[in-house]
Amino acid sequence: MSNSGNIKLINIGFGNIVSANRLIAIVSPDSAPIKRIIQEARERGMLIDATYGRRTRAVIITDSDHVILSAVQPETVAHRVIEPEEDFEEDIDVEDEVDKR
């Protein structure tokens, strides 16, 4: 990426944050090859389950060979990669309001 000096963070659901610069793919978990990738990552200790027990809707593959499971749709995660500022501004505003109480 051209912004290698900047770290872009994206929310993948339930307050879990991933570095957008490390993403290789955001895919649906439904196909057999992706299910195999998930199982292999689990066996290697490289699986991160960020679903909080919810149904896996997106599988995020990183450049470090980590596989991250998210309960957020792949399209939503992709949108957050493209437009990350909007999502964080909303999250920060909510947190600031809670801190002021």
UniProtKB/Swiss-Prot annotation:
Pfam families noted in UniProt: RemA-like
Residues annotated as signal peptide: none
Domain of life: Bacteria
InterPro entries to which the protein is assigned, alphabetical: RemA-like
Similarity field: Belongs to the RemA family.
PANTHER family in the record: REGULATORY PROTEIN SSL2874-RELATED (PTHR38449:SF1), REGULATORY PROTEIN TM_1690-RELATED (PTHR38449)
Record's protein name: Putative regulatory protein Csac_2087
